[in-house]
Amino acid sequence: MFSGSIVALITPFTPDGEVDYISLKKLVDFHVDAGTDAIVSVGTTGESATLTVEEHVKVVAKTVEFAEGRLPIIAGTGANATHEAVTFSRLLNNTGIAGYLSVTPYYNKPTQEGLFLHYNAIAQETDIPVILYNVPGRTAVDMRPETVARLSEIKNIVALKDATGDLSRVAKHREMCKEGFVLLSGDDATGLEFVKLGGQGVISVTNNIAAADMAKMMHLALDGKFDEAAIINQRLMTLHKNLFIESSPIPVKWAAHKMGLIANGDLRLPLTQLSEPARPIVAQALSEACIY
């Protein structure tokens, strides 16, 4: 279920700042048609930090509704307070999701034991599969491989999204974690190499606008056809990098609007529109990727 090309989906807004459910449905259909393997709803790229609890739950539920069982939906449920993460899990438990993606607690910098206890508490509240999410560049805490290995022994903790960009960890996680534990890259620029080293897929920002190419690349890689996959990856490499020229999801939301995938490219403060100097840089990356 959790492998291949998984999109970290953007959350579209109307000009007055409300969630744009018409564009959201269009995005879901776009990914179904492109062969995307799963959708992460309301993760970091989906601006989870600026949605209310009610909006968060509704966006996930509507994404499940729009998918109509055509691909699995994974709900972002991270929080820096364990009780809040548990509450999200409870609220989303009956929405039809296939799993939770739970980022490490941010800002308060827990110890490794604190991380273990945090995720253990979440796992005890649900039978739905939990995907760990390690992104120290955003959270200021790094979940070490030893902690991931301990957590992998918990029945419904089934996968890790590793956005460290440290490819040496693939082998460490593969060696230390229980058999069958899924490793997913959270870094587009190194995602293909991650799979080559033993990962099972990528949770991708690039996928928002290059869904068919990302799906084809990941499926080739999982079939062991790395030379063919590398050709696609090389064409997308500038895009992988330039979608982070400003804080994500600022560039990818601008690109999605430019391509007509969403009706409006606005974000919620404190995130702002892509700056004027950055726009031609992202536009050039779209051109080099041959997707617009």
Curated annotation (Swiss-Prot):
Its EC number is 4.3.3.7. It catalyses: L-aspartate 4-semialdehyde + pyruvate = (2S,4S)-4-hydroxy-2,3,4,5-tetrahydrodipicolinate + H2O + H(+). Pfam families: DHDPS (PF00701). One of its GO terms (biological process) is lysine biosynthetic process via diaminopimelate. It is found in: Cytoplasm. CDD domains: DHDPS (cd00950). The record marks T44, Y107 as: Part of a proton relay during catalysis. Gene3D superfamilies: Aldolase class I. SMART domains: DHDPS. PROSITE patterns: DHDPS_1 (PS00665), DHDPS_2 (PS00666). The keyword Endoplasmic reticulum does not apply. The active site is at Y133, K161. Pathway: Amino-acid biosynthesis; L-lysine biosynthesis via DAP pathway; (S)-tetrahydrodipicolinate from L-aspartate: step 3/4. InterPro entries: Aldolase_TIM, DapA, DapA-like, Schiff_base-form_aldolases_AS, Schiff_base-form_aldolases_CS. Keywords: Amino-acid biosynthesis, Cytoplasm, Diaminopimelate biosynthesis, Lyase, Lysine biosynthesis, Schiff base. GO terms for cellular component: cytosol. It comes from the Bacteria. Catalyzes the condensation of (S)-aspartate-beta-semialdehyde [(S)-ASA] and pyruvate to 4-hydroxy-tetrahydrodipicolinate (HTPA). Homotetramer; dimer of dimers. Belongs to the DapA family. This is 4-hydroxy-tetrahydrodipicolinate synthase.
